[in-house]
């Protein structure tokens, strides 16, 4: 299973902002520190804001900061928010499934259990546990 760049960027934003101890961080700062397009990050931050994970403040002195305690944000919840679907194989999508093996396929159920276990493990990882000081890499601010 591979996560999209969108999810990767969302996790990076949350980790970077979470490491700033409530300081407002500009999207430009995050973009520069991670080598990511500011325009793309703007979309990511907007989505995180709509989900109540970050607070955005407009204006000259504006920026982004966490809207919740990082201990209450799980990697699993972020992945579910930002990934378009978890359709690993065609038969996971009933509307598009044309596989003739589907009615008797055991693999479909095994893959479904594996996906569930993957997400369950990600639900055990809080944002707080991956921030600097919790074993994470040091992140610098401007």
Features from the language model and the residues they span:
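N-terminal helix-turn-helix DNA-binding core of bacterial DNA-binding proteins
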Residues: 3-5, 11-36, 55
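Key DNA-contact positions within bacterial/archaeal DNA-binding proteins
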Residues: 39
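Beta-hairpin "wing" of winged helix-turn-helix
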Residues: 52-67
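Charged, amphipathic alpha-helical coiled-coil/dimerization segments
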Residues: 63-80
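C-terminal regulatory/oligomerization modules of transcriptional regulators
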Residues: 74-75, 93-142
